[in-house]
């Protein structure tokens, strides 16, 4: 600790302690699960070609009769504009002149201010991506709060691909509900509606705290694990995350891995929290291979040096005023999260 003039009496000194830093919670479950694959486009839009394969069922005919004939696969093209997101900051001499550095007894420097600005910038980009991906999973729409692309109402992946969102009410407030039957509805729907050429072998449910708590305390679940000696021992200890960080409780039941996601966007400690998963809801997705089912497309920056180049996840540029009066930091990211197979995202409700 170093002595500094007291704030109450300029003729006295007090010790400056180590700083107490309050940091917003940082969430990134979609990144940890690897739900979205990443693709990079060189243009400001992406065009998806949908090819629908088909097979025929042969019938017997008399010899010499006209043969059954085949046909080619169906296909159609869809084009979607990539939204443009920007976040800028700047530094002036007044931000440094005569200022004490954060948590130190030295004068502020340009490098320290720049480092803080870039740290906040990186955090903003990461928070935006997590919020955007969860928004797409929960609503079936890309994150475009101002609807700058997709018309007045924006894109809706269920409408764009001609699918209907499947929902299952787990009726967790009813003590006699058969949870396994409810889980089987989700599993059967994914198997029947996959159309990916693959097999849905397991399922992940990203749950709100309310859904998760009602699930693990439901009488049929408690009874099923009453005499189960192995992990998880839900009757004797708090569930713990396996493979993720300890904030994410998880519970495997009925071929579904339920993960509690308490996360939400909160710009500053104590500020308003915009939850990722609405209260009492859960989002069910296939447990593996989702990087080909759900995609994040990145487009290039709006700069000459990046024209027609593969898009990066984020860009940052620094410009110094020729007169030395300010330093400007520009950043941007251009992305769209697409549910290529929206029918494989199932909405679950606690009641």
Swiss-Prot record:
The lineage of its organism: Viruses, Duplodnaviria, Heunggongvirae, Uroviricota, Caudoviricetes. Assembles to form an icosahedral capsid. The assembly is primed by the interaction between capsid assembly protease and portal dodecamer, and major capsid proteins assemble cooperatively to form the procapsid with the help of capsid scaffolding protein. Major capsid protein forms hexons and pentons of the icosahedron. Viral genomic DNA is packaged into the procapsid through the portal vertex. The packaging triggers a dramatic reconfiguration of the capsid shell. It comes from Pseudomonas phage KPP10 (Bacteriophage KPP10). It holds the Pfam family Phage_cap_E. Keywords: Capsid protein, Host cytoplasm, Late protein, Virion. Its main location: virion. Homomultimer. It is found in: Virion; Host cytoplasm. InterPro entries: Major_capsid_GpE. Belongs to the lambda phage major capsid protein family. This is Major capsid protein. GO terms for cellular component: host cell cytoplasm; viral capsid. HAMAP family: CAPSID_LAMBDA. Transmembrane segments: none annotated.
């Amino acid at each position: 600790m170093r002595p500094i003039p007291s704030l109450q009496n300029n003729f006295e000194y007090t010790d400056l302690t180590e700083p107490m830093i309050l940091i917003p919670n940082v969430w990134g479950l979609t990144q940890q699960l690897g739900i979205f694959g990443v693709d990079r486009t060189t243009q400001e839009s992406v065009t998806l070609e949908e090819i629908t394969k088909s097979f025929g069922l042969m019938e017997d005919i008399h010899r010499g009769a006209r043969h059954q004939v085949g046909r080619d696969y169906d296909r159609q093209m869809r084009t979607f504009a990539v939204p443009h997101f920007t976040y800028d900051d700047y530094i002036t001499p007044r931000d440094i002149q005569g200022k004490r550095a954060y948590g130190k007894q030295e004068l502020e420097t340009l490098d320290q201010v720049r480092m803080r600005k870039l740290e906040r910038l990186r955090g903003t980009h990461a928070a935006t991506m997590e919020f955007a991906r969860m928004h797409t999973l929960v609503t079936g729409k890309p994150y475009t709060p101002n609807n700058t692309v997709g018309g007045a109402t924006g894109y809706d992946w269920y409408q764009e691909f001609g699918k209907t969102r499947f929902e299952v009410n787990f009726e967790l407030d009813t003590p006699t509900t058969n949870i396994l039957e409810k889980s089987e509805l989700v599993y059967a729907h994914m198997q029947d509606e996959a159309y990916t050429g693959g097999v849905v072998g397991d399922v992940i449910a990203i749950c709100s705290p309310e859904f998760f708590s009602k699930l693990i305390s439901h009488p049929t679940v408690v009874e099923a694990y009453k005499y189960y000696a192995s992990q998880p021992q839900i009757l004797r200890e708090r569930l713990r995350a396996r493979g993720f960080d300890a904030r994410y409780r998880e519970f495997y039941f009925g071929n579904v891995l339920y993960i509690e996601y308490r996360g939400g966007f909160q710009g500053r400690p104590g500020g308003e929290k915009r939850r990722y998963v609405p209260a009492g809801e859960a989002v069910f997705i296939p447990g593996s291979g989702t990087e080909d089912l759900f995609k994040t497309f990145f487009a290039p920056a709006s700069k000459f040096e990046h024209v027609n180049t593969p898009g990066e996840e984020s860009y940052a540029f620094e410009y110094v005023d020729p007169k030395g009066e300010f330093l400007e930091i520009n950043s941007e990211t251009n992305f769209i999260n697409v549910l290529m197979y929206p029918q494989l995202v199932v909405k679950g409700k606690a009641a």
